[in-house]
């Protein structure tokens, strides 16, 4: 499964592409889309949209993973980040990709082992997990960590989702570790 991870930002949007086969991870590509700050908001969003669309076209991922945005101390910063995230979601939707969303806590915990990891710890673990020669840039590392998070948790979520749906209906049950109809 090829996963495109995205760390959205209005100034810098990181992307990272990883192949996951079982527990094996393989680095494909990563980078940072640097958005000129002197552009109008609509044009800045277009830069993100166009570049992510191109990344998806070139790397041909099967699925995408995106960090969920939470409110922070500055509401206007949160709103602007939401715009960048929206541009990323549009690019992914236009590319026909299913999008899975994760919190920063989930991403850090899945990649580093603790949800309170520092950026440097995330960079070092991404470098280690993907056997990279150098330390990835912060935005690229965050995007790669998002892809790694999906590689670690996405397949489990997909296996559990039918179980969750049927257990609520009361029509299925589990016996000896197997889902019964």
Curated annotation (Swiss-Prot):
It comes from Bordetella avium (strain 197N). It is found in: Cytoplasm. Gene3D superfamilies: Ribonuclease H-like superfamily/Ribonuclease H. It holds the Pfam family RuvC. One of its GO terms (cellular component) is cytoplasm. Its main location: cytoplasm. Keywords: Cytoplasm, DNA damage, DNA recombination, DNA repair, DNA-binding, Endonuclease, Hydrolase, Magnesium, Metal-binding, Nuclease. InterPro entries: RNaseH-like_sf, RNaseH_sf, X-over_junc_endoDNase_Mg_BS, X-over_junc_endoDNase_RuvC. Binds 2 Mg(2+) ion per subunit. Mg(2+) 2 binds at residue 67. Its cofactor is Mg(2+). Mg(2+) 1 binds at residues 7, 139. HAMAP family: RuvC. The active site is at residues 7, 67, 139. Its EC number is 3.1.21.10. This is Crossover junction endodeoxyribonuclease RuvC. Disulfide bonds: none annotated. GO terms for biological process: DNA recombination; DNA repair.
């Amino acid at each position: 499964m090829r996963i495109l991870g995205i760390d959205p930002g209005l100034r810098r949007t990181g992307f990272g592409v990883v192949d996951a086969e079982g527990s094996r991870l393989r680095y494909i590509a990563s980078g940072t889309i640097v958005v000129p700050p002197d552009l109008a908001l609509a044009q800045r969003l277009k830069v993100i949209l166009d570049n992510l669309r191109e990344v998806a076209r070139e790397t041909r991922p099967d699925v995408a993973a995106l960090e969920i945005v939470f409110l922070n101390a500055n509401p206007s910063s949160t709103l602007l980040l939401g715009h960048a995230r929206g541009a990323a979601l549009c690019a992914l939707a236009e590319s026909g990709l299913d999008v899975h969303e994760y919190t920063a806590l989930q991403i850090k915990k899945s990649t580093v082992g603790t949800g309170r990891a520092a950026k440097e710890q995330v960079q070092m673990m991404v470098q280690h997990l993907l056997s990279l020669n150098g330390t990835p840039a912060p935005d690229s590392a965050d995007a790669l960590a998002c892809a790694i998070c999906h590689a670690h948790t996405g397949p489990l979520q997909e296996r559990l989702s039918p179980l969750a749906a049927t257990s609520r209906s009361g029509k299925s049950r589990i016996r000896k570790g197997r889902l019964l109809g």
